[in-house]
């Protein structure tokens, strides 16, 4: 089928070709050198690599995809979507692989940064890896820890490529500005080479000590404050300031979520096709991340009241926080 510059009228099936991400002979040599009955975790990793083999899908859209729904669903991400669309256009009718410059999404919590990354993976037809930097204290989470250490394991990048099906997954580094780690180890140190196309092609995880090709990974980092991010990282990414959606956009997001939740559940048919303007106005006061929980609460309250219409009184109170669990002083 021709892949000329033809307007796309619907979703396109991604084009996939195979890409080798590691050298089988190198893995075999490493496995053969392991002492008997030692380094069982490392032995299992090498065996898993040999069993699955080095070939992974490298995917890209088979043409310029229709992105109207994404523009509608993510109104505060238009500049990012514009750049993604341009980079897809460059490779859509060529033999070139898809290249997307690493993205850094800056903005307050709850504006949809992580949701955008999931939608990007869906748009491109690839997988997604996720690292929540704020919840981690181990500095080796991205690049792995030496197999000499007790409890060591491969890093998230290695796992996404070796255990996954794709050579070019979307890799999300969430809340990169909150990266912790031991004082003697920079948890973001491995990103300096991973975010550079040339050096990422020969990335060596410290646990497996086998080079893997991470050059095709599509990087999406999220953060609230750029001041906490090292300058070498900022120099390697395209930075986007993501604002909270305005009132009109927030109402559209709320309406789309209502329709999506209603359509995803059999019980949804018992509710009105669209919510009232007053309910949407109330929902628009919430951050996008909070809207789904609020709709589920509202649907449940309406059902308990034996109604098929969601009313303002069904919505949770604005600013209501979950009570902490544990002792109080």
Mark where each language-model region is:
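C-terminal engagement/docking regions of AAA+ P-loop ATPases
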Residues: 304-329
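Walker A/P-loop
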Residues: 98-133, 162, 231
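Conserved catalytic/switch belt of AAA+ P-loop NTPases
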Residues: 173-212
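AAA+/SF3 P-loop NTPase mechanochemical coupling elements
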Residues: 165-168, 203-222
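Pre-Walker A (pre-P-loop) alpha-helix and adjacent loop at the N terminus of AAA/AAA+ ATPase modules
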Residues: 61-106
């Amino acid at each position: 089928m021709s892949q000329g510059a033809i307007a796309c009228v619907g979703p396109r099936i991604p084009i996939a070709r195979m890409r080798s991400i590691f050298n089988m002979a190198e893995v075999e040599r490493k496995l053969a050198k392991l002492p008997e009955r030692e380094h069982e975790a490392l032995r299992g990793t090498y065996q898993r690599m040999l069993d699955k083999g080095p070939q992974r899908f490298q995917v890209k859209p088979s043409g310029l995809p229709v992105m109207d729904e994404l523009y509608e669903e993510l109104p505060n991400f238009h500049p990012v979507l514009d750049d993604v669309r341009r980079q897809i256009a460059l490779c859509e009718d060529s033999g070139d692989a898809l290249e997307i410059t690493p993205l850094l999404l800056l903005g307050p919590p709850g504006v949809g940064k992580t949701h955008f990354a999931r939608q990007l993976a869906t748009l491109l037809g690839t997988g997604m890896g996720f690292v929540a930097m704020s919840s981690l204290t181990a500095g080796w989470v991205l690049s792995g820890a030496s197999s000499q250490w007790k409890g060591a394991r491969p890093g998230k990048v290695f796992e996404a490529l070796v255990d996954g099906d794709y050579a070019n997954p979307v890799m999300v580094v969430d809340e990169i500005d909150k990266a912790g780690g031991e004082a003697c180890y920079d948890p973001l140190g491995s990103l300096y080479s991973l975010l550079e196309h040339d050096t990422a092609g020969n990335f060596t995880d410290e646990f497996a000590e086998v080079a893997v090709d991470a050059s095709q990974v599509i990087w999406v980092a999220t953060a609230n404050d750029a001041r906490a991010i090292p300058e070498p990282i900022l120099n390697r990414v395209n930075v986007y300031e993501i604002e909270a959606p305005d009132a009109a956009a927030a109402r559209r997001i709320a309406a789309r979520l209502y329709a999506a939740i209603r359509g995803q559940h059999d019980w949804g048919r018992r509710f009105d096709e669209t919510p009232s303007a007053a309910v949407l106005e109330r929902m628009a006061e919430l951050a996008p991340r909070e809207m789904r929980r609020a709709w589920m609460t509202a649907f449940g309250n309406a059902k308990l009241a034996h109604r098929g219409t969601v009313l303002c009184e069904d919505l949770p109170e604005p600013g209501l926080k979950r009570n902490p669990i544990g002792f109080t002083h």
